[in-house]
Curated annotation (Swiss-Prot):
One of its GO terms (cellular component) is presynapse. The lineage of its organism: Eukaryota, Metazoa, Chordata, Craniata, Vertebrata. This is Voltage-dependent L-type calcium channel subunit beta-2. The modification Phosphothreonine is found at residue 549. The gene is Cacnb2. InterPro entries: CAB1-4_N_A-dom, CACNB2_SH3, GK/Ca_channel_bsu, P-loop_NTPase, SH3-like_dom_sf, SH3_domain, VDCC_L_b2su, VDCC_L_bsu. Residues 555-590, 605-618 have a biased composition (Basic and acidic residues).
Length: 655
C-alpha cells in the first residue's frame, strides 16, 4: 500500500509530514482499525493536494476566513442603510421640534378640562415622550389641567401645583396599555417564581403602586377594594413560595376574594373629570339652616367676597347635589329609584346644578358654593365635584352649646340635633375628610387662614406663563346677561345697553364707586345719593350680590334674575333719585338768578340783545345740567342694580 502511494513520487516535505502523522497515529491506542482508517483518509487527502503541498480542504477554510473578515459585505453597512438611518433621525428631530412648538403654543391656551388621577405615574419609565424629559409625573388623587390633545397617547397639560410647568400627560389609552404590559410581565414572572421568589416579588411590587390599587378610599367601593388589598398581598406570598401544596390549598380562597376586587377595579378609569377650579364648600360647626351655623358661614362668605373681589364667584345651591353620584348619573336604571324617593330635588335639577358649577369653574375663578343641603363631607365624596371642604370647627362643645342657647328659645329647642351633627363632624378623620380646618378662636384669624389657602390654590391654578385674559370668562359672563326675549333685548339697547358688561363683571361695584372721583362736579351733585346708597348697603349687613350668585333653582329663573331689574330701572330711578333732580333744578335756578343780576348791572345796554343773550345762556346751562345727569345716570343705575341684587340678611338666615 505504501509502495503504491510512493510510486507517484510526492515531494520530500509531504513525505516527511506524512511519516510524522503515521508515528502519531501508531502511538495512539487505536489498533489496526485506526491505522487502516487513517490510511484511507490519507489517500483521500492526497487526492486533493496541490502542487505546493496544500490540500483543497485548507484552501476552502482559508476562503471562509476571508469571507468573515472586516472587508466582507455583511460587517460593513451599505450606503442605503446609512441614508435610511439618517432619514429616520431627521424625521424624529422634526417631530420633536413640532411637538416643542405645540407645547409652547399651548401655554397661552385656556384650560379645556381638569381631571383627578386615580393612578400613579412616573415619567422616568417612559422613552417615547414626544419631547424627551417633558412628561409629567403624578401621584394618585392629584389634579391635572389639560389644555389639548396631542395624539392618541399624549395630552398637553400641567400638574395643578405651584411651580409646575406645562408638559405631556399620558392619555387613558396609554395608561391602559401600560397596565396590560405590566400584567403580561407579571404573568411571565410567575414561571420563574419557584426559582427566584424574591426577584418576582420585587418586580410585582413595582407594578402594584402604579396600578389602581394605590387609590385612597373615597367611596364605599374603594373602601371594599382597599380592604381586600391586605388579603391579596398575603395570598400571592403563598403563590410565590416553592411549595406546590400551598398553591392547591389557597387557590380556591384566593379566587373567591380576588374576584370582587378585580370586578370593581375593572371599571375604574385612570382619570375622573372634575371642575377646572375645585369648588369651595363650607361645613360646620353644626347644621345649616340654624342661626349659629348660618351666621358664622355668612361672615366667611362676606370676607371672601371682598378679599377676592374680581376673582371669585359665590353661588347659592338649593338642589341636593349629594344625589349627583357618579354611579347614579352614569346608570340610568337607578334614575327611577331616585325619582321615586322622597327627595326635594329631581335628578334633572341636580344635573343642571352640576353643569352650572362646571361652567362657572371654566372661567378659572374661585367658586364658592353656599349649598343648603351639604352638612358632611361624605355627601360629596362620590360626586365628580372634588370640592375643597372647609370645616368651620368649634373645638369645645360647651362653647357651641352656649352659642346655640344664646340665639333664643326657637334655636335652643333644636339643641340636641345640632350637637349630634357637630359630633359627627368631629369624628371625621381630618386628613382624609377636610382640606381646611378653621378652629381659630378669632374671626380675623380664621379668615386669614382660609385666605392663605385660597391664595396658594390660586397660584397653583394660575401659573405665571399662562396669566393672559381668559376668553371663557368674558364669554360666560356675557352669556349670563343675555335677555330672555327679543322685546327685552330691544328695550335694553339704549343707554342701559352700554352698562350691561358692568353689571355682569365682578368689578362693577368698584367701578361705580370710582366713577365719581373722575369729576369733582359730578361727585358734589350726587353726594347725597352715594351716602344713601352706602347707608343702605351697611344696613343690609354686606349681603351677597346677585351678580355673583345664581340663587334660583332653574335656568329660566336664573336668567330672569338678570332681566327683571332692568324693566323697573326707570321707575325706580324716578322714585328714588328725585332729590337729584331737585338739586339740579336749584343749580339751574341759581344760574338764572346770576344772569338776572348780570342783566341789572348792564341795564344801559339794549334790552332785546340782553334778553336774547340770557335765553341762550339759560338753554346752554339747562342742556349742560341734563348732560351731566345723563352721565351720572349710568352710575346711579349700576348702584341701584347692586342695591336691588343684595340679599337681606334676615331672609338669608333661615329660621
Amino acid at each position: 500500500m505504501v509502495q503504491s502511494d510512493t510510486s507517484k513520487s510526492p515531494p520530500v516535505a509531504a513525505v516527511a509530514q506524512e511519516s510524522q502523522m503515521e508515528l502519531l497515529e501508531s502511538a495512539a491506542p487505536a489498533g489496526a482499525l485506526g491505522a487502516q482508517s487513517y490510511g484511507k483518509g490519507a489517500r483521500r487527502k492526497n487526492r486533493f493536494k496541490g502542487s505546493d503541498g496544500s490540500t483543497s480542504s485548507d484552501t476552502t477554510s482559508n476562503s471562509f476566513v476571508r469571507q468573515g473578515s472586516a472587508d466582507s459585505y455583511t460587517s460593513r453597512p451599505s450606503d442605503s442603510d446609512v441614508s435610511l438611518e439618517e432619514d429616520r433621525e431627521a424625521v424624529r428631530r422634526e417631530a420633536e421640534r413640532q411637538a416643542q412648538a405645540q407645547l409652547e403654543k399651548a401655554k397661552t391656551k385656556p384650560v379645556a378640562f381638569a381631571v383627578r388621577t386615580n393612578v400613579r405615574y412616573s415619567a422616568a419609565q417612559e422613552d417615547d415622550v414626544p419631547v424627551p424629559g417633558m412628561a409629567i409625573s403624578f401621584e394618585a388623587k392629584d389634579f391635572l389641567h389639560v389644555k389639548e390633545k396631542f395624539n392618541n397617547d399624549w395630552w398637553i397639560g400641567r400638574l395643578v401645583k405651584e411651580g409646575c410647568e406645562i408638559g405631556f400627560i399620558p392619555s387613558p389609552v396609554k395608561l391602559e396599555n401600560m397596565r396590560l404590559q405590566h400584567e403580561q410581565r407579571a404573568k411571565q414572572g410567575k414561571f420563574y417564581s419557584s426559582k427566584s421568589g424574591g426577584n418576582s416579588s420585587s418586580s410585582l411590587g413595582d407594578i402594584v403602586p402604579s396600578s389602581r390599587k394605590s387609590t385612597p378610599p373615597s367611596s364605599a367601593i374603594d373602601i371594599d377594594a382597599t380592604g381586600l388589598d391586605a388579603e391579596e398581598n398575603d395570598i400571592p406570598a403563598n403563590h410565590r413560595s416553592p411549595k406546590p401544596s400551598a398553591n392547591s390549598v389557597t387557590s380556591p380562597h384566593s379566587k373567591e376574594k380576588r374576584m370582587p376586587f378585580f370586578k370593581k377595579t375593572e371599571h375604574t378609569p385612570p382619570y375622573d373629570v372634575v371642575p377646572s377650579m375645585r369648588p369651595v364648600v363650607l361645613v360646620g360647626p353644626s347644621l345649616k339652616g340654624y342661626e349659629v351655623t348660618d351666621m358664622m358661614q355668612k361672615a366667611l362668605f362676606d370676607f371672601l367676597k371682598h378679599r377676592f373681589e374680581g376673582r371669585i364667584s359665590i353661588t347659592r345651591v338649593t338642589a341636593d347635589i349629594s344625589l349627583a353620584k357618579r354611579s347614579v348619573l352614569n346608570n340610568p336604571s337607578k334614575h327611577a329609584i331616585i325619582e321615586r324617593s322622597n327627595t326635594r330635588s329631581s335628578l334633572a335639577e341636580v344635573q343642571s346644578e352640576i353643569e352650572r358649577i362646571f361652567e362657572l369653574a371654566r372661567t378659572l375663578q374661585l367658586v364658592v358654593l353656599d349649598a343648603d343641603t351639604i352638612n358632611h363631607p361624605a355627601q360629596l365624596s362620590k360626586t365628580s365635584l372634588a370640592p375643597i371642604i372647609v370645616y368651620v370647627k368649634i373645638s369645645s362643645p360647651k362653647v357651641l352649646q352656649r352659642l346655640i342657647k344664646s340665639r333664643g328659645k326657637s334655636q335652643a329647642k333644636h339643641l340636641n340635633v345640632q350637637m349630634v351633627a357637630a359630633d359627627k363632624l368631629a369624628q371625621c378623620p381630618p386628613q382624609e375628610s377636610f382640606d381646611v380646618i378653621l378652629d381659630e378662636n378669632q374671626l380675623e384669624d380664621a379668615c386669614e387662614h382660609l385666605a392663605d389657602y385660597l391664595e396658594a390654590y390660586w397660584k397653583a391654578t394660575h401659573p405665571p406663563s399662562g396669566n393672559l385674559p381668559n376668553p371663557l370668562l368674558s364669554r360666560t359672563l356675557a352669556s349670563s346677561t343675555l335677555p330672555l326675549s327679543p322685546t327685552l333685548a330691544s328695550n335694553s339697547q339704549g343707554s342701559q345697553g352700554d352698562q350691561r358688561p358692568d353689571r355682569s363683571a365682578p368689578r362693577s361695584a368698584s367701578q361705580a364707586e370710582e366713577e365719581p372721583c373722575l369729576e369733582p362736579v359730578k361727585k358734589s351733585q350726587h353726594r347725597s345719593s352715594s351716602a344713601t346708597h352706602q347707608n343702605h348697603r351697611s344696613g343690609t349687613g354686606r349681603g351677597l350680590s346677585r351678580q355673583e350668585t345664581f340663587d334660583s333653582e332653574t335656568q329660566e329663573s336664573r336668567d330672569s334674575a338678570y332681566v327683571e331689574p332692568k324693566e323697573d330701572y326707570s321707575h325706580e330711578h324716578v322714585d328714588r333719585y328725585v332729590p337729584h333732580r331737585e338739586h339740579n333744578h336749584r343749580e339751574e335756578t341759581h344760574s338764572s338768578n346770576g344772569h338776572r343780576h348780570r342783566e341789572s348791572r348792564h341795564r344801559s345796554r339794549d334790552m332785546g340783545r340782553d334778553q336774547d343773550h340770557n335765553e341762550c345762556i339759560k338753554q346752554r346751562s339747562r342742556h349742560k345740567s341734563k348732560d351731566r345727569y345723563c352721565d351720572k345716570e349710568g352710575e346711579v343705575i349700576s348702584k341701584r342694580r347692586n342695591e336691588a341684587g343684595e340679599w337681606n340678611r334676615d331672609v338669608y338666615i333661615r329660621q
